[in-house]
Swiss-Prot record:
Keywords: Amino-acid biosynthesis, Aromatic amino acid biosynthesis, FAD, Flavoprotein, FMN, Lyase, NADP. The keyword NADP applies. It is an enzyme of class 4 (lyase). This is Chorismate synthase. GO terms for cellular component: cytosol. The keyword Flavoprotein applies. NCBIfam families: aroC, PRK05382.1. Its EC number is 4.2.3.5. Reduced FMN (FMNH(2)).
Length: 372
């Protein structure tokens, strides 16, 4: 099974299944000298973890990272960093009734068609459990980016079903289980999710990620465009069905005079490009958004077929998220950070002696457009 590694100078390989003994990753290409301890992974892993609120899966994993290699006396050595997390709360019996059925909307059918065999326990390799190791690898990338360049990568839930934020404050994002930027709306979200969970249904969501402090010049033209690599990385996350960068699909209704980001000696006047033009960073905040579909693991019966092609009714038991988007911000942050670190290393390798060319336009608008 291929395609378990991504990145060029910073290459990350993940392995393991949802109900296997462990999951892990290997980070190859991290520069030496970065201080790193197992305890540093706990914060972001807990942000992603299930069981954080009644609105996520009830599965409870300790998610304690073991550093197997690549770190000596608390510092990275420049050799591959191997991380391992042992699974401790599997409940494989929940999947006994669907072992020979294809759950609609899941990868059961496509894995079966491709490999002729599949692990039905929690989706096996296709489970969102795999994203735990992306978040772990992202901890390394976030720390390196912040220390080396002052880059900060943050995400938030920007839409839950039809509900959108009525205001914005970064301080609010980490103070509620929804990563929601408007504290006053949290009771509304709680009530919405309670009703949804009782009905046995699920709902989609949107997550925004903002990378601030990124220098101009990162990325490559044509086939190595930064926005292309960000899109590919984010589309690899479970349940993601769409990616926007900057104004995204909203640019289809804009005029050129609206969309172009005018420049002055004091900075850009807007950021419809999302911080990337021609595949290369402008120095403005990078703004990306992802659309996550509603999970197909439902207690409501639905039509499907079994491995013999016979029609059956499927009801998915077990512990599942009624909205996978609620836990997605740390995952999306990690993927953005890993792509940026890889691009930073590539830029340093090819163009490290170029520096920032004059004029370097100052950033004078935040991640939200000045005309929003």
């Amino acid at each position: 099974m291929g395609a378990n590694t991504f990145g060029k100078l910073l290459a990350v390989t993940t392995f393991g299944e949802s109900h296997g003994p462990a999951i892990g990753c290997v980070i190859d290409g991290c520069p030496p000298g970065l201080e790193l301890a197992a305890e540093e992974f706990a914060h972001d892993l807990q942000r992603r973890a299930t069981g954080r609120s009644r609105h996520t899966s009830a599965r409870r994993e300790a998610d304690e990272v073991e550093i197997l290699s690549g770190v000596y006396e608390g510092r990275t050595t420049g050799t591959p960093i191997a991380l391992l997390i042992r699974n401790t709360d599997q409940r494989s019996k929940d999947y006994a009734t669907i072992a020979r059925q294809f759950r609609p909307g899941h990868a059961d059918y496509t894995y079966w068609q491709k490999y002729g065999i599949r692990d039905p326990r929690g989706g096996g390799r296709s489970s969102a459990r795999e994203t735990t190791m992306r978040v772990a690898a992202g901890v390394v990338a976030k720390k390196w980016l912040k220390q080396r360049y002052g880059v900060i990568v943050r995400g938030f839930l920007s839409q839950l079903g039809e509900i959108r934020p009525e205001g914005f404050a970064w301080d609010a994002v980490e103070d509620n289980p929804f990563f929601w930027p408007q504290a006053a709306q949290v009771p509304e979200l709680e009530a919405y999710m309670d009703a949804l969970r009782k009905s046995g249904n699920s709902v989609g969501a949107r997550v925004d990620v903002v990378a601030e402090g990124v220098p101009p010049g990162w990325g490559e033209p044509i086939y190595g465009k930064l926005d292309g690599e960000l899109a590919a990385a984010l589309m690899s996350i479970n349940a993601v069905k769409g990616v926007e960068i900057g104004a995204g699909f909203g640019s289809t209704v804009q005029k050129g005079t609206e969309h172009r980001d005018l420049m002055t000696p004091l900075g850009f006047l807007s950021n419809h490009a999302g911080g990337i033009i021609g595949g290369i960073t402008t120095g403005q905040p990078i703004i990306v958004s992802i659309a996550l579909k509603p999970t197909s693991s439902l207690r409501l019966p639905g039509e499907t077929v079994d491995v013999d092609g016979h029609p059956v009714q499927v009801i998915t038991k077990g512990r599942h998220d009624p909205c996978v988007g609620i836990r997605a911000p740390p995952i999306a942050e990690a993927m953005v950070a890993l792509v940026l670190m890889d691009q930073a290393l590539r830029h340093r390798a090819q163009c490290g002696d170029v520096g920032e060319m004059s004029p370097c336009i100052l950033e004078n608008v935040g991640f939200r457009n000045a005309d929003d």
